[in-house]
Swiss-Prot record:
Protein name, per record: Segregation and condensation protein B
Keyword set includes Cell membrane: no
Species assigned in the record: Latilactobacillus sakei subsp. sakei (strain 23K)
Pfam families xrefs: SMC_ScpB
GO process annotations (BP): cell division; chromosome separation; DNA replication
Lineage: Bacteria, Bacillati, Bacillota, Bacilli, Lactobacillales
Gene name of the encoded protein: scpB
């Protein structure tokens, strides 16, 4: 198997949190020196490839993929557009989970949804609907996420206490068995807030 492709896929799913060299080495079963060489090679490839909008950087002890500075204006124009046209239902689902379970890590969000959530988290961060709330005291010290003050302003809320209580939902044995159903429960409850207090044009799903 192509080790560079393996590393690239790990960097992609790791998202903004990044992934350590040691973690990569364990997952692809190579020694750290070999992984370091591969990371250097991959970083050089991104840097020299004019057909790619990405770079590979090292931040503290983690490696992560980031967009090239040359495209900052383009990305700003995208994220400055109406929320209703650029937030997917997946991002809203992640936002709903964060709303009711904050602060929590990306991995904890993934566990609720049953799928990887890095892309949705990046969208919400760029939209300033969520912010980093420190780091969890756990191996790797993963980032904790929570809602921002702008989240309250955008949805017309004075405080999180105005949200419908999660306990009002009816949890059946059938729904409790599935991660996807559990995530859907958070979303349905949050959707009530979108309908009652959110902007006139509520964000619509793209997928």
């Amino acid at each position: 198997m192509n080790h560079l492709a393996e590393i690239e896929s790990l960097l992609y799913v790791a998202g903004d949190e990044g992934i350590t060299l040691q973690h990569i080495a364990r997952l692809i079963m190579l020694d750290e020196a070999a992984v370091r060489q591969l990371l250097t090679k991959l970083a050089k490839r991104y840097q020299e490839d004019e057909q790619s909008g990405l770079n590979l950087i090292q931040a503290a002890d983690c490696y992560k993929l980031v967009t090239k500075k040359a495209y900052a204006g383009l990305l700003k124009a995208y994220f400055d557009g109406p929320v209703s046209t650029s937030i997917s239902q997946a991002a809203l689902e992640v936002l709903a989970i964060i709303v009711y379970r904050q602060p929590l890590t990306r991995i904890e969000i993934d566990e609720v949804r049953g799928v990887q959530s890095s892309g949705a988290i990046q969208t919400l961060l760029a939209r300033q609907l969520i912010v980093e709330k420190g780091r969890k005291d756990a191996p790797g010290r993963p980032i904790l996420y929570g809602t921002s003050d702008y989240f309250l302003d955008y949805f017309g809320l004075g405080s999180l206490k105005e949200l419908p209580e999660l306990e009002q939902m009816t949890l059946t044995d059938d729904t409790a068995e599935s991660d996807n159903d559990s995530a859907d429960l958070y979303y349905r409850q949050f959707e009530q807030t979108l309908n009652e207090t959110g902007p006139e044009t509520a964000p619509k799903g793209e997928q």
